[in-house]
Amino acid sequence: MSEDDTKLMAPPSSFTPELQSESPKSAQISYRFMCPGPGRFQCSSTGLVFVMAQKTELVYKAIQWNESVLQPSGKIPAGLLFKIQCPEDAVCQLHLPHCETKDAEFLKSLLSVVHITDDGMSILKPLEITDTHVIVTVSHFSAFGIVRAFEVFYRFFSNPCPVHGQVLLFLRPPNLNSQRQNLHLVVLSRNVPLEEVRRRHQDSVYIPAPLKCLLFEDQHYTVDCPTAFIVQPKKADFDLDFGPNYHPTFEIRLSTSIKVVTIALRDQKNTDVWKHDVDLTGPGPEGNHIFRHGL
């Protein structure tokens, strides 16, 4: 076995891509990676894994789905649609992250990958589906994305399984006149990259917190926050949302004097599926508000 073959079979090496945007306030970003040579490389921002055959430059970005193109094929989005640019034959395989918790046998009938070019759309049968990724063989690039088989999904809807979800927190600048601040909760599937959401909330401060939870599609959720003046809406359905806007799922209104707040996301049975004590203060010794530190 050659050295290059060994690299192609090795676990992926993580890399942090260079982020590029059209302007400082642009919500559209591209990811750039100078691949050093053959091997497996995983993007720390998107979760994508590229199995590379050669040294090259990779440039990729998430673009908006056109669901009217998918509908005739009986497919619905199950992940972001990525437009990828690189030389032909530079990539052997592409691993796209999914959010499913179902077993591998079921996923074989549920998930596939679409390849969209200027000539139209083709559906690729996965080479393999792991607990985290859908793997396809590729040779040339344009746009790739994971899709679900609509008929298969709703055939088993009476006995649903959860998907891997995440809760992202964004604190709006305080209103000094009313002495109020708004904390936004964005509830999404696990395979939506954080950076894609952050770019849609550039006027807010992202608050790191444990992200992971299990969520059921088309079921409603509520937020409990005892120190809030108001939480709105009172309940919200969870749907797979792959952008491009990523609006807040819940808004929590708080006094600016609040430094720490406990938030719980609850399901229809009033069971906590996610709970966290959120620190709304900055790193200074007096715990000044994070906006006063310019973070």
Located regions from the model:
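A structural signal for beta-rich interaction modules in eukaryotic proteins
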Residues: 1-111, 115-295
